[in-house]
Design a protein with these regions (language model features):
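Catalytic cores of Mg2+-dependent Asp-rich isoprenoid enzymes
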Residues: 1-77, 93, 116-122, 138-147, ...
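Short helix-to-loop capping/linker segments positioned immediately adjacent to catalytic or ligand/cofactor-binding
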Residues: 104-114, 128-137, 186-187, 191
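Hydrophobic alpha-helical segments and helix pairs
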Residues: 73-123
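Classical nucleotidyltransferase
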Residues: 151-157
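Eukaryote-skewed repeat-based solenoidal scaffolds used as protein-protein interaction platforms
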Residues: 127-151
Length: 239
């Protein structure tokens, strides 16, 4: 099991009730996606970012030729019957992240969601197919995924200097959008289509707690123990 998906992490609970081969594939693909997109989100020197992206480009080439080094890609390789498909999607992701290096995320929520969709859609769609099956409502699952990624970015930016951190009203707006979408999805998602739903549920609760504590103390955020979250919906979605 990858370190990013051990007990206590969001990926652990999001994938908990899937069959092993699906669970490990979901976690591996999401870990790789997060690692690549984080290069653009972290405020690092452009030349360093380009070196990291070049490494990932070569790593995807190695994945396609059955010689990956990254733990996530090695785990994914065990179950991936279509390495060329994943390879194309990961190369596209690296290219899109490359175009974003040095650009500040838009402060307009709608534009930011469009940027997230443009960068992540192929990988998110692949994850949706793995987690929800061919008959799942992929558009609904993808909507959750895009909003959840925005929440991820906002929460990550809270560690930046106060002048660069998102305003409280932005956190509140994203949390309300995420909560509203989750409320709709909880009534329409089919049994077992809960990977992105669970990730978003966790972030929704973390955002709620964060906004309550944000003004009082920006530097000390109380994060929800996520082990308490999945118990409440486990029976409802998985029996």
């Amino acid at each position: 099991m990858l370190d990013d998906a051990i007990a206590g992490t969001d990926l652990y609970y999001a994938s908990l009730y899937y069959p092993t081969h699906i669970r490990e594939s979901l976690c591996a693909l999401e870990v790789a996606r997060r690692a690549i997109t984080a290069i653009q989100q972290k405020k690092i020197d452009h030349s360093v970012a380009n070196i990291k992206l070049s490494w990932w480009w070569d790593e995807v080439d190695r994945y396609r030729s059955n010689k990956p080094r990254h733990p996530a890609l090695r785990q994914l390789k065990k179950y991936d019957a279509l390495p060329e498909v994943i390879g194309v999607e990961l190369h596209a992701l690296v290219e899109k992240v490359q175009t974003q290096i040095g650009q500040q995320p838009s402060t307009n929520q709608h534009v930011r969601l469009e940027d997230i969709q443009s960068i992540n859609e192929p990988i998110f769609r692949h994850i949706a197919q793995l987690s929800a099956g061919e008959e799942g409502d992929h558009n609904l699952v993808l909507k959750i995924a895009y909003l959840n990624e925005m929440a991820n970015q906002l929460l990550s930016s809270l560690s930046e200097p106060q002048s660069m951190a998102p305003p409280t009203n932005t956190l509140t707006s994203v949390r309300l959008d995420l909560s509203s979408t989750l409320s709709i999805c909880s009534r329409t998602l089919r049994r077992g289509q809960t990977f992105f739903f669970t990730l978003a549920l966790i972030n929704s609760r973390v955002l709620e707690i964060t906004t309550k504590n944000f003004i009082r103390n920006r530097n000390r955020l109380e994060l929800l123990p996520i082990t308490k979250l999945w118990i409440s919906w486990r029976t409802r979605f998985w029996g």
